[in-house]
Design a protein with these regions (language model features):
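Short acidic, Gly/Ser-rich segments with clustered Asp/Glu that frequently serve as metal-coordination loops
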Residues: 109-111
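Nucleotide/phosphate-binding catalytic cleft detector across ATP-hydrolyzing
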Residues: 1-107, 116-232, 239-265
Length: 265
């Protein structure tokens, strides 16, 4: 989506079918889902596929019905909804069916989802609309204020991936970034450091941590003790931000582990 957002000069209008974890454009979402179905399931005139769609916790009944509606409009026979945190936990290999507490934090593009699970169900869950997209905007705003230069969402995302970090380590990285000077209107290249990106993302990362803390505070004591012992598991694209596990661990006092394949959980 970030690459698509940067093609405005070609007279192409880029849209985000989903925003903050919910449907923003019904028609575009339907076409997107149809494309996924066509790529993964062989077409048949005799049968329609059954699909399972992961949804954020905390969405409204109206938003749930909108998701189901898109699923049926895309040509499916049955649509089943499941919470993203449950899918992420299973994908991360957590034993969610056992009589003990496990905690998953899924930091995606539009939302960060966190939950404590036990006996195959969700005991406590929270969701905030601060995740990868928000971090990209944080970087854009930081560059605008510090350098008086505007950069695109694609550049901001690449900066986050390449040199972004939640805490500083011994080796600080640098990256040349192309943008447009707000003073002259001309192209300009600036140099961003890991420290710049850390500072840009800090406030949003703190908000994610505060939501994790809130989830733990709402967790029954015996399950919270399990989480304290076994740790918190992180999934989603933003789980790959350098030192994010150390940052969350330092703020919560709990061991933090990154899922083996966080982007595909």
């Amino acid at each position: 989506s970030s690459a698509a957002s940067d093609v405005y000069k070609r007279q192409i209008i880029a849209v985000r079918p989903l925003k903050d974890g919910v449907i923003a454009d019904f028609s575009a979402t339907r076409m997107l889902m149809q494309t996924f179905i066509e790529k993964t399931i062989q077409k048949s005139i005799f049968s329609k596929p059954r699909v399972i769609i992961a949804i954020p916790c905390g969405i409204t009944d109206v938003e749930e019905r909108a998701v189901e509606g898109v699923g049926y409009k895309a040509g499916t026979k049955d649509v089943y909804l499941i919470e993203e945190v449950m899918v992420a936990a299973i994908g991360a290999g957590l034993k969610v069916d056992r009589p003990e507490g496990v905690m998953i934090v899924d930091i995606g593009g539009g939302t960060s989802e966190m939950a404590v699970l036990s006996l195959g169900g969700i005991v406590v869950e929270n969701s905030i609309k601060i995740a990868g997209n928000r971090l990209d905007l944080d970087i854009i705003e930081y560059v605008k204020k510090k350098f008086n230069v505007i950069i695109g969402e694609g550049e901001a995302e690449e900066v986050k991936k390449q040199i972004g970090a939640a805490t500083l380590s011994m080796a600080e990285e640098k990256m040349n970034v192309k943008g447009r000077s707000l003073a002259t209107g001309l192209p300009e290249v600036i140099v961003l450091t890991t420290a710049d990106v850390k500072d840009a993302m800090q406030d949003s990362l703190i908000k994610i941590v505060n939501s994790i803390k809130q989830t733990l505070e709402e967790t029954p004591p015996e399950l919270a003790a399990d989480v304290m012992e076994k740790g918190i598991y992180i999934s989603g694209g933003c789980a790959q931000i350098k030192n994010l596990d150390r940052f969350i661990s330092a703020e919560t006092g709990i061991p933090v582990f990154i899922a083996e394949d966080p982007t595909n959980c």
